[in-house]
Amino acid sequence: MAKTRTKKNANKRVVKGTLDQKHTEKINKFENMSKALPKKKEKLKKHEAQLEELMSLNPNKFTHENIRRKSYLMDSIKNLKEEINSIENCSESLDYIVNTLPILVNYYDNGDIVDDDKEELISEAMADGKKNILSYFFKETSQQENSSESNNDIVKNGTGGSTSKRKKIQPSNRCSGSKTGKVTETKPRLSRAKLYDNYLNVTDPHYRKSVKKSQNVCSVPDCDGEKILNQNDGYMVCKKCGFSEPILLTTDKPNYKEPTQDSGTYAYKRINHLTEILSQLQAKESTDIPNKVYEAIKRELKKRKIDKNDLDIFRLRRILKKLNYRKFYEHVPHILQVINGKEPPNFSRADEMKIKALFKSIQKPFAIYCPKNRKNFLNYSYVLHKFCELLELDEYTNYFPLLKNNAKLLQHDKIWKNICDYQGWYFYKSL
């Protein structure tokens, strides 16, 4: 059965609110708050009585329900007192008046406001002879002000003596002059949309004011030409007078006027890899291990009933293998130091320099005796194990295990024996 999808009405008109509507909602809110004051006081007395009844009970016989009820009543009493105090002191309404009074005065009492059709559903309460919305807060001072305001809304027709009231005063007729007919400068006129925007900025914390993009106008006096962007050179150039000024551009597009640098490929250096392995063993590397790895290790230690102070590198490797965290093998000394605070193995500077010197010295004999079908260097853990044997650093040999595969271990021993003969070193068999 085919499904039918109802089309939305694309021409549906979205109605935008007005300042008059928002202001009326605020006034209604304040009135409702005042009407709700007796109920809040009654609720406060009721909660205070319930709390006093709970406080009179023996604390040793308190149940979880009593504790929750007591906490709820204390919070409710505190909130009710704050609300009652705010309503009685008119704190919220006074703050609203102080913040919005200049905007409301301009909106309702300023005859120079321009209706630019950006604010919809404009209230015509004043034009219909109803009270000004500010009358909720202020009383009219005199009848003369009302008569003068009504006279300003009367426009005489040509030579005829008849008069007619208009709901909106046309901006073109708002000019001041003397009896001789001389016209002076008109005051700057405001728009309803601008006032509405200012009102929302003051009253609505979630409202984001729309920021208009600044026009690219030339700064040369008496020019006012439009500036255009020359992206290749990074300049803003005036189309009228040719004035240019540099501008900072951030872009990922390449500039073809600038020469491109060749990113050359560099050969992998074995000595760098050896240095990295030594740093990892001594926990000197800078690495960031996720917290979930530490938490998983601690849970596994608790499950196996292993004291963290008895944990060593080899046990930690087995735990990481079980947890499927093999990629952290090379950071085992660092992880161990974080878990139990034990100092990792540490080579003296002299021993570390000797190891690096021995490593550099075997590069030439390795190139000579390396089988033709072999491309990679010897296993680094195997090489470091042999260096520790030659330098009599037996306490470090356990940190560099030999190969588990006997066939591969024999191949390494064969190459290493030739290197030892070439260098004049003593050869230690692995098997």
Swiss-Prot record:
Low complexity compositional bias, start-end: 143-152
Region Disordered, annotated ranges: 142-187
Coiled-coil segments: 28-95
GO terms for biological process, alphabetical: regulation of viral transcription
Polar residues: compositionally biased ranges: 170-181
Presence of keyword Metal-binding: yes
A GO term, aspect molecular function: zinc ion binding
Record family assignment: Belongs to the nucleo-cytoplasmic large DNA viruses (NCLDVs) VLTF-3 family.
Task of the protein: Putative transcription factor.
Name of this chain's protein: Putative transcription factor R429
Organism placement in taxonomy: Viruses, Varidnaviria, Bamfordvirae, Nucleocytoviricota, Megaviricetes
